[in-house]
Amino acid sequence: MKEFVISEAQVETAILVGLITQTQDERKTKEYLDELEFLAETAGATVVKRFTQKLPAANSVTYVGKGKLEEIKEYIHQEEENEREVGMVIFDDELSAKQIRNIEAELKVKILDRTSLILDIFAMRAQTANAKTQVELAQYKYMLPRLQRLWTHLERQGGGSGAGGGKGSVGFRGPGETQLEMDRRIILNRMSLLKERLAEIDKQKSTQRKNRGRMIRVALVGYTNVGKSTLMNLLSKSEVFAENKLFATLDTTVRKVIIENLPFLLTDTVGFIRKLPTDLVDSFKSTLDEVREADLLIHVVDISHPDFEEQISVVDKTIADLEAGGKPTMIVFNKVDAYTYVEKAEDDLTPKTRENITLEELMKTWMAKLNDNCIFISAREKINMDELKTIIYNKVRELHVQKYPYNDFLYQTYDEE
């Protein structure tokens, strides 16, 4: 069976669709759509239009209401008349098979949701056999309950009893149902094979981790695109792929780092994101085991991002879901060089908002909140890097003495360039 991981980024135009609900206000919806646009651009698409609608919850049939769907349809039609074809419509939440089928029937263009878009980017980014296997398994998990949509063209073959003796559902009797069941079996068999491969990879990686010697393991964690790989490069003096795109890192990279005369292992991990598909987290178990087995987590945060506090919450929740919560953790607020704020006029008596807070005020707030267990840096501009190394050195040394009290682990004094 041909492997499912094939994804070439081609420039296509896209429309984004999101909802404003009781639990997601207009500001948050805008931030989610900004992120969705960044995802679309990472996948190779150009966003030409956004549509939002206020609803108590997503419409179970078409996600948005009938009127909004008609509005989107009219926009696509107008673009076609102006010889500007819309390649796809991307929805900010995961769609059911029924929703995708109904929306496609109305809009007549490719329909994606946030999950399928993330999976596509992961497929594009996967380089090693391990990453490709993990992505392929996640893709099949996503595709399996949506198989029926892939066979809607068989509904036109008629409703005769066929070989199935009339036992299938309306529109899926006969050869359609047979093919659907065959495909389901093929995919289930393929998934079983992929799981066996990943189990073997898990075993190999577990052995590798045990053979790394008596050194403290430190893992860089954080939201996607916060600068983990750039920081990894600075600390390890190696060249880990770093790019201003989402999910630039899929495979974990482990490097031996020496600060002064203290060696330890540093791991760069895949970035987290809001609404990260559960199947993706499950499929990347072997990769995320590096987080579970770390002695110290360095949580990297992009402080210049307007919604960095929610990103912190997303990462904390994901770490808790991985059963890696409770580990010694320090927060590194990165990108201080990119932080901006709007100064209020002297006669403006309205309360300060997030955009009016200076970096100094923010630093004081978070240092008090975290009991000074944080530092503010710029990996790109190398601001406060010496201070960061000193903090890491002290934390790793303390952990090493606790974990390996009788191990003479210090190297001969190591002079950094």
Name each region found by the language model.
Residues 117-138:
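Short alpha-helix plus adjacent loop in nuclease-associated cores
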Residues 2, 210-213, 234-264, 273-283, ...:
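Switch I (effector-binding) loop of TRAFAC-class P-loop GTPase G-domains
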Residues 2-5, 30-34, 57-74, 251, ...:
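Switch II of P-loop NTPase G domains
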Residues 8-9, 77-84, 256-260, 265, ...:
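Conserved catalytic network of the ASCE P-loop NTPase/AAA+ motor domain
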Residues 1-119:
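N-terminal accessory targeting/assembly segments
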